[in-house]
Amino acid sequence: MGISVAGMVLWAGTVTGAEAARSTGRPNLVLIMADDMGFSDIGCYGSEIKTPNLDKLAGDGVRFRRFYNGARCCPSRASLLTGLYAHQAGMGGMEPDRKVPGYRGNINKQCVTIAEAMKTNGYATYMSGKWHLTRHARAWEPEEPKFNWPRQRGFDRFYGIIGGADDYFAPRGLVRDNTSIGQEAKDDPGYYFTDAVSDSAVGYINDHCKNSPDKPFFAYVAYTAPHWKLMALKRDIAKYKGRYDEGWDVLRKERHERMITMGIIDKKWPLSPRDERVLPWKDATASAVGGKVEEALKIT
């Protein structure tokens, strides 16, 4: 039995019913992606945030310290899912169509997604979470073009959002396969998108192991968390009550020290200079922050 999982790291583990990996030599694969997450935002990279499951996976696998990405949603996802530079895949920037090659707001037909490649090689393919590889993301519009949605780019099943961000408690752009189901989330008082993405991925894998045990699978699990909007469950907010009262200046020093201790960065690397444009935590009141926004608008 075998399953390989990739997120910030690669590792191996097990999943019930994964006979295909043993019989064919082709492992089941799970690719996990977080959204807009900082380098030190999980425990195994020096964070104060508790992430025991990710820490264990990193401890059993490989923890990368050097990387390159497109720094924004669409280009990073385009590269991740095609193996190409973002411009080669057609998404050198975000989703607006700039009418020039490399900036068309859709991954192009000249590239092959990992789902399309896996499917060609006999894999079942599943996706849960955020797509954000097309400018056609108004899922609630019946006539919205779907030629570049997950189902049309190699995934057998899809649950999530097509666009870049949505409400965590009632995502308007929620989609199942090619059908808009935003109202389902709105009608569910206990709905939370992060949990729903996890539940969907687990459901796909369980169904696969029950119905197609001799076929390998690839599952892509792409959370919107911790991307804005910053919307957490009350129980999670309560867990960290008071933890950030000292402010970000103290926090950044603590993280820097932990990263050195953990061997993630060299002790010779000093803490980066503080951005003087950022207010000290004690001064970051709503009125002060609002004033900063107003100043920026006047300049632009």
Region spans (language model):
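Formylglycine-dependent sulfatase
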Residues: 1-9, 13-300
